[in-house]
A protein has these predicted regions:
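Short, Lys/Arg-enriched N-terminal segment that forms or immediately precedes the first helix
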Residues: 1-9
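Amphipathic alpha-helical dimerization/coiled-coil segments
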Residues: 2-3, 90-122
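N-terminal helix-turn-helix DNA-binding core of bacterial DNA-binding proteins
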Residues: 10-53
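A cross-family signal for key residues in well-ordered alpha-helices
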Residues: 22, 37, 56, 93, ...
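Basic amphipathic alpha-helical segments that dock to polyanions
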Residues: 54-61
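Glycine-centered, phosphate/nucleic-acid-interacting loop/turn motifs that mediate DNA/RNA or nucleotide
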Residues: 65
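Short beta-strand "wing" residues that participate in macromolecule-binding interfaces
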Residues: 69
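Basic, amphipathic "hinge/linker" alpha-helix immediately C-terminal to the N-terminal HTH DNA-binding motif
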Residues: 74-96
Length: 122
């Protein structure tokens, strides 16, 4: 998948597509290596995407109609650029909103509530 020495894989599972959609929404178009470097830079090296998880995720998003691709030759080597479709832009915003709502819900469960005493009998 992708490695992160600070967080468990289970904690990060399911966020890769949201990360990819968000980056592409911000940058317009990017190629694979550029995406890995942007994630590494923005997370101060806490999340390192591996090709084995990046490209399957990009292909899945493309199959779902969220991404389009264009090939450009750099010298003799082809480079595939990924760009959000209109549906992908909408999906990016939906997923980010959903993730933030989930964070708020987690806080309600995880943060101490005034007047509640956990682990004690009434």
């Amino acid at each position: 998948m992708y490695i992160c020495p600070m967080y468990s894989k289970e904690l990060l599972k399911g966020t890769l597509s949201t990360i990819l959609l968000t980056l592409l929404d911000e940058k317009g178009r990017m190629y694979g290596y550029e995406i890995t470097q942007a994630v590494k830079e923005r997370t101060d090296g806490k999340i390192l995407l591996k090709e084995g998880s990046l490209y399957p995720a990009l292909h899945k998003l493309e199959a779902e109609g969220f991404l389009s691709t264009e090939e450009e030759f750099i010298g003799k080597r082809p480079r595939i650029y990924y760009r959000l479709t209109a549906t992908g832009k909408a999906q990016s915003r939906i997923r980010v909103d959903e993730l933030f709502q989930f964070f708020e819900t987690l806080q309600q469960v995880l943060l101490p509530q005034p007047g509640l005493h956990y682990g004690t009998a009434g």
